[in-house]
């Protein structure tokens, strides 16, 4: 089971991804296509429902034109 600080981090990262996606006026579908990950995974990451790999974060950040460090 995840600790509170881990859950907070997962939710914070997801929220930053969502905000950047909206800033770029992208749909979850477009982000999933650009990052080559399933659309439902984008939604779950944004809602803080799942933790994800560094590789997936890298793909998302590349699609959102940000650095991974911008998520923390």
Where are these regions (language model features)?
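A short, Lys/Arg-rich alpha-helix, primarily the initiator
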Residues: 2-22
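Short basic helix-loop element that most often maps to the first helix and adjoining turn
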Residues: 15-30, 34, 59
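Short, basic-rich loop-to-helix N-cap that marks the start of a DNA-contacting helix
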Residues: 49-59, 68
């Amino acid at each position: 089971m995840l600790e509170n600080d881990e859950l907070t981090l997962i939710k914070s990262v997801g929220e930053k991804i969502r905000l950047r996606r909206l800033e770029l006026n992208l749909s979850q579908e477009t982000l999933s296509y650009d990052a080559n990950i399933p659309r439902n995974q984008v939604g779950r990451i944004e809602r803080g429902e799942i933790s994800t790999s560094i590789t997936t974060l890298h793909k998302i950040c590349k699609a959102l034109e940000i650095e991974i460090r911008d998520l923390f």
